[in-house]
């Protein structure tokens, strides 16, 4: 833990991240579970050091302005005999029925109707925030709590839903500013509504629909994107139903799914401009952002818990330029409140143009009190010259970023153009241009 702080904290600051989420750090017997099958809910894994070392790491991150979240697993636990399974010789923490007692991963499901189980899990979640100063927790597999075995056809598990509401309400009472995030792929309403108003009490919900639509779109041959044009507009139909987070997580870079960069259509050189444009689209889209480690350097090999990332990729100019782009994009995001201040308010976003199916151009606008940022995207394989941005308001607009600048691995010289009387853009293939007012 302590050695990690010496390397990770400077890297996060340089890369433009203000928050880090750790995969589960509760003690677990199997590396291949990534920490999601726990045996020690009150014990930091000894793989990386001592409890004191973890406390020091979190405090050092706070001293450097970095929030720290922890992945927490309230759904199931490992089946090892020295863990919670049949703890007193009977089914104490788990269900007696195998039909609902065994998860799809072969682990034991918690029986959330029992008061003892509820207190155990709520105490464990609070323990990590109280003793280690984590700023919040991301709860895994919430769909498996809402519905029996995560299957909507089997109906809502009322006791488990009551437990989540009860736990979140209690955590907010004890740690009012904590961040509670739900990994949930269901359409169950009110996940981020306050618990005392009938919601589940989370602050954020993973937007799995946005993630699937976006990645599927960029895997398409560019010739098919005209027909699939509205895959990238559909998410705004429900964007304000919950407080969403846009996740490009560990789950999307394992098990044969390919890495984020590899998912982009085309050959090696063609993938990079598409990934740059996609990440710009992500930053302009309402919702908080999550990016898994390695995505920022253009990792080509799927994540393997037994190996570190392929840092030698940065010896290749195209990967170094991609990392330079991701750093600048992250810092740009943090420095412009229009991109995050009104993520959950309808007056913080507007489509300027979402009817350019033939040219595969999109234009959107993000707003804060005194700032406007416009994103214009060409996701076709052809240059789109002479595109007149349909501005809502006349005035001066300055080019913040062009994903096709040479410094990012593109073809255009960095000029940071200023537009005074309308914005007419020459858009490179697979490119994004960001503009700011004033």
Placement of each model-derived feature along the sequence:
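Substrate-binding/active-site clefts of carbohydrate-active enzymes
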Residues: 2-156, 420
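Conserved alpha/beta catalytic core and glycan-binding cleft of carbohydrate-active enzymes
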Residues: 133-135, 148-306, 334-340, 344-389, ...
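Conserved, mostly hydrophobic/aromatic
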Residues: 22, 41, 61, 128, ...
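Active-site rim elements
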Residues: 152-154, 261-270, 310-320, 419-424
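Active-site His/acidic residue clusters
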Residues: 36-39, 304-313
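C-terminal beta-strand-rich structural cap/linker in extracellular carbohydrate-active enzymes
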Residues: 414-438
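Non-transmembrane alpha-helical segments in soluble domains
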Residues: 9, 58, 125-129, 168, ...
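C-terminal accessory region downstream of the catalytic core in glycan-modifying enzymes
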Residues: 314, 318-322, 329-331, 388-417
